[in-house]
Amino acid sequence: MLPGLLQCAQLRSLPVRDLAYLLTAPPPWHSGVEISRQRLLGPQGWPQLLALDADPTPLLAWLAARPTRRLGLYAEALLGYWFSQAPHIELVAANLPVRDGTLTVGEFDFLLRIDGEPCHLEAASKFYLQLDSAPHALVGPGLRDAWWLKYRKLASQLTLAQHPAARLPDGFAQLTASSRLSGWLFFPADTAPTHPAINTAACRGWWCRRQDSWPQQHPHSRWLALPRLQWLSPAQADEAATQSLAAMRAQLAQAEGPWLLAELLPDDHGVWQEVARGFVVPDSWPAPELLGTLLPRLAA
């Protein structure tokens, strides 16, 4: 497991672990204006997360009032909870649109006061697979998104306060624009990022085709298929919820689409902890028709 995620492994509640991940994970790429984890956590951030892990009822109630099946909205809800509860942060606005007549120019993810200072924070949690050695060839598993598109969009969003149509709350004229990026990047064996903006310390995994040999770190590890809303933080599971490598391969033999899998080993308390993760994709991935639609957008 990445050293930066070891603290997350101490947390047993999945939503609390996901929240800690969103606040502390290394960014997949450098935006140039990344907010520090220390500033988001504040002086008592980790004790507050431990207390929330001991009794996650308030966070669970917050999420229950905001049900979603979309990972991005789930992540936004988690961050919204933290920004509404952390004593050093004031949540002023979330998802505030900027409209120029009938045209929506963009949307502020969060407008915050952190230790009294106004901040525009753009947040994103992304998962991309490296197709080949081309610098921009990091694409989403569904081939509807790509890193280069998000990279350019984020750069634009971070300047949103400068747009003539932007209407900011009182006291935000001198705001600071920052980003909080999280997510995972997945690479074929023996490949590495090629774009200088990619963070070499990012959370990384592998990807391979279903019929290939799957990378395995330990001969006695167990495996777990991760639903989309469990993609954020490193997985934990009881042994009964896991499978052997052979059983997992058999289960996915006829499965459709990419599947995200976690490889796990038991810790000293008998909890199976993620040690690696990767996408297993069909032999036909990437689908030519979807890739053919995506690639021209990358070249634009």
Identify what each model region corresponds to:
Residues 1-300:
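Intrinsically disordered, low-complexity Ser/Thr/Pro/Gly-rich regulatory segments
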